[in-house]
């Protein structure tokens, strides 16, 4: 490739080769004439490129345009390659946007080369050339309208063929127009000021010099073939014309490829097509004449970089084509005699808006920023200001959380009870308040407490009063949160008041449960003094009362040293458990009494000395037997269960007799000992604990080894054994000594009354 500033022209032939291949691929099922025409055009383009190379070496850069025109004129004078060379120059005029108005004058200039040279020399100055271009356009239009009159006789024979072939040609041209608009437009745009304008001037002068009759004879067939797409394009409408303004170069090149064909269109169709082409040609030509001095550099830069035309140019072309389309719709079917007036009117109408359009790029640049702020304002327009239900501050989109038809900050979406942060999957709401699911279940669903939980009515007046006091003292931050909820749309004032009462009642409920749990140990201490309960309560099998609930820690049986009370306790527990129908009451000894097992096991430690002291004085035999029984039990607790039961029964019978004989003293001593035992085992007050050592102190020197022995062996071992074997031992004892236990319980009642 030679280093010339217009090497880009070779891209035209290359792009046209590509379009020929694409056309052959697209139009496989259609007529092959278009492909043949393209092949001829390719050859002509290659020859033109070779001649351009030769002329480029001979001519200077400023006279390079003349050399190009001479080469083109030679190709036009050639009858074989006239059409191809003409189309080679025509693609260089993309800004003209006209469909067919340029080709007939091309042939006219081919026959009048000297006049064309003179015209080119006259207009070497670009400014003068641009100024005279509209005049040249007007000059080249009048003879064309006359030529159309002359070709009536020639075209009548081939109207039907042209109408048939026009449709196929139009269909064949459509895909290429859509495919190659960008490539051809980019590459061919740079030749607008060079060849296209000169051709227009040559056409203008030659149309003045030549008679319309000779012009008609020479260019009639080609012009009619150019206008072959007669009514099809007009029927497409203004939208297609405006879109095809960009594709004008491609359409012109295709029509020039069809030059060898004969014309077959009717006069009316040809006139309509001709006027449409004239109006379209005048609008881009006049615009290009004023656009060139100011934007030739930008055009060259665009073509060098193969950049598609700028948005302003595109919009200008579209506007020009729209104006021409409106003019075409007005001048669709004129009378042949009115051609000149219609052409002049269309030209003046097309030029008037276009002379105002060179100002439009500036106006457009100013209007684009005006329109863009509106778009940006729409894009960045903040939505309606939203405030958080909890904190009443503005909620921005990134921290917005929509839950329960209310807007929250993500950080403010917390449980109103425990203030833990929640998400959409871990919250539950009631009357506009947000809770975590555990507290929602705990507050509103536990124990079937629906009325209180859901705020329909106060469940218990006691709890409500407690809750009001606690709400003012313990939790002053909750009423503001309850007051914030009215801002949410779905919450009313009455439910909010209910929710306040509800929260108070919930806290009252929780506090009452805690108080009950705290008070239970104290109650058990008081009630264990009255243990065992009366026989009527155990035999009745009624629902266990508070005293019975507290007596459960007595189970499992205490140390084997204290077998005097343990079998009876076990027996009563078992009877009550078996007679009570609820599983909850049966399982309660193993759940509620877990905390009291250790204390109940520790309580027998001082019992053996106290018992020994209480019964050793009146009946030494009883104490000896009891001592032997206890010693054997402690020494061999597991293998001697039968002996234990027999010893217990014997001891209980003797004990009953002893109680009958010496009631006042034995009862007093035993009652005080039992009191001291119970209070020491459960950590009772110190005043009552002092009574027990006073009772115990005389006996301690007699049996020094008993307390330690009971500590080390029996308490620890039996704590495990009683849990495992308690029920079995209870059954055996119950079968042996039911009556004695009833008697003993009655005696305990009398003891308590006496005390």
UniProtKB/Swiss-Prot annotation:
Subcellular location, record wording: Cytoplasm; Cell junction, Focal adhesion; Cytoplasm, Cytoskeleton; Cytoplasm, Cytoskeleton, Stress fiber
Database matches in InterPro entries: EPLIN_Lim_dom, Znf_LIM
An example Gene Ontology biological process: ruffle organization
UniProt motif Required for interaction with NPC1L1: location: 164-166
PROSITE patterns per record: LIM_DOMAIN_1 (PS00478), LIM_DOMAIN_2 (PS50023)
Region (Disordered): 43-151, 168-226, 241-379, 468-493, 505-714
Self-association state and partner proteins as the record states: Interacts with NPC1L1; bridges NPC1L1 with MYO5B. Interacts with MYO5B; bridges MYO5B with NPC1L1. Interacts with PXN; this complex stabilizes actin dynamics. Interacts with F-actin and G-actin. Interacts with LUZP1 (via C-terminus); both proteins restrict ciliation and may work together to regulate this process. Binds RAB40B (GTP-bound); interaction influences LIMA1 subcellular localization in lamellipodia during cell migration.
UniProt name for this protein: LIM domain and actin-binding protein 1
Species for this entry: Rattus norvegicus
UniProt lineage: Eukaryota, Metazoa, Chordata, Craniata, Vertebrata
């Amino acid at each position: 490739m030679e280093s010339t500033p217009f090497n880009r022209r070779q891209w035209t032939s290359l792009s046209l080769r590509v379009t020929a291949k694409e056309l052959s691929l697209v139009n496989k099922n259609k007529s092959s004439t278009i492909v043949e025409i393209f092949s001829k055009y390719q050859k002509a383009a290659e020859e033109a490129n070779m001649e351009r190379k030769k002329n480029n070496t001979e001519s200077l850069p400023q006279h390079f345009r003349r050399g190009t025109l001479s080469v083109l004129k030679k190709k036009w004078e050639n009858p074989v390659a006239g059409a191809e060379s003409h189309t080679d120059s025509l693609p260089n005029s993309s800004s003209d946007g006209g469909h067919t108005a340029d080709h007939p004058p091309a042939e006219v200039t081919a026959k009048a080369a000297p006049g064309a040279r003179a015209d080119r020399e006259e207009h070497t100055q670009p400014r003068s050339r641009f100024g005279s271009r509209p005049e040249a356009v007007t000059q080249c239009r009048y003879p064309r309208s006359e030529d159309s009159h002359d070709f009536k006789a020639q075209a009548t024979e081939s109207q039907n063929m042209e109408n048939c072939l026009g449709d196929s040609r139009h269909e064949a041209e459509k895909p290429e127009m859509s495919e190659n608009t960008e490539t051809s437009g980019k590459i061919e745009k740079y030749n607008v000021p060079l060849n296209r304008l000169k051709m227009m001037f040559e056409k203008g002068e030659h149309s003045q010099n030549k008679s319309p009759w000779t012009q008609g004879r020479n260019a009639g067939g080609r012009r009619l073939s150019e206008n072959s797409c007669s009514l099809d394009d007009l029927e497409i409408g203004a939208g297609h014309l405006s879109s095809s303004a960009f594709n004008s170069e491609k359409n012109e090149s295709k029509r020039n490829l069809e030059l060898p064909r004969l014309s077959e269109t009717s006069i009316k169709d040809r006139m309509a097509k001709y006027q449409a082409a004239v109006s379209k040609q005048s609008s881009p030509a006049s615009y290009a004449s004023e656009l060139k001095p100011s934007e030739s550099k930008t055009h060259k830069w665009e073509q060098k970089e193969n950049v598609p035309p700028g948005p302003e140019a595109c919009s200008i072309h579209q506007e020009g084509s729209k104006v021409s389309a409106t003019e075409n719709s007005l001048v669709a079917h004129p009378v042949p005699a009115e051609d000149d007036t219609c052409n002049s009117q269309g030209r003046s109408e097309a030029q008037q808006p276009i002379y105002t359009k060179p100002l439009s790029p500036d106006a457009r640049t100013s209007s684009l920023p005006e329109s863009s702020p509106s778009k940006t304002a729409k894009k960045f327009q903040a939505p309606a200001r939203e405030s958080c239900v909890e904190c009443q501050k503005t909620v921005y989109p990134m921290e917005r959380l929509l839950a329960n038809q209310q807007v929250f900050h993500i950080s403010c979406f917390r449980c109103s009870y425990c203030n833990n942060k929640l998400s959409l999957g871990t919250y539950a709401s009631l009357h506009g308040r947000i809770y975590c699911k555990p507290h929602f279940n705990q507050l509103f669903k536990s124990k079937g407490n629906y009325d209180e939980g859901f705020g329909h009515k106060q469940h218990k007046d006691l709890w409500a009063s407690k809750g009001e006091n606690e709400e003012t003292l313990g939790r002053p931050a909750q009423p503001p949160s309850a007051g914030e909820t009215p801002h949410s749309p779905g919450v009313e004032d009455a439910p909010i008041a209910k929710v306040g009462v509800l929260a108070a009642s919930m806290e009252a409920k929780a506090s009452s449960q805690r108080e009950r749990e705290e008070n239970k140990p104290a109650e058990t201490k008081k009630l264990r003094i009255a243990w065992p309960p009366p026989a009527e309560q155990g035999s009745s099998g009624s629902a266990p009362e508070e005293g019975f609930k507290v007596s459960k820690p007595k189970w499992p049986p205490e140390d084997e040293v204290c077998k005097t009370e343990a079998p009876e306790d076990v027996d009563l527990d078992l009877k009550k458990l078996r007679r009570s129908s609820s599983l909850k009451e049966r399982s309660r000894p193993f759940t509620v009494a877990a905390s009291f097992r250790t204390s109940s096991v520790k309580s027998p430690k001082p019992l053996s000395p106290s018992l020994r002291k209480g019964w050793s004085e009146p009946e030494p035999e009883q104490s000896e037997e009891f001592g032997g029984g206890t010693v054997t039990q402690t020494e061999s607790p597991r293998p001697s269960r039968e002996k234990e039961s027999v010893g217990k029964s014997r001891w209980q019978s003797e004990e009953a007799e002893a109680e009958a004989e010496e009631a006042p003293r034995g009862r007093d001593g035993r009652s005080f000992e039992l009191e001291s035992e119970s209070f020491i085992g459960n950590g009772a007050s110190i005043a009552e604990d002092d009574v027990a050592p006073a009772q115990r102190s005389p006996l301690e020197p007699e049996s020094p080894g008993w307390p330690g022995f009971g500590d080390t062996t029996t308490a620890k071992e039996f704590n495990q054994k009683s849990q495992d074997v308690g029920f079995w031992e209870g059954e055996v004892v119950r079968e042996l000594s039911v009556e004695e236990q009833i008697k003993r319980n009655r005696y305990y009642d009398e003891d308590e009354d006496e005390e």
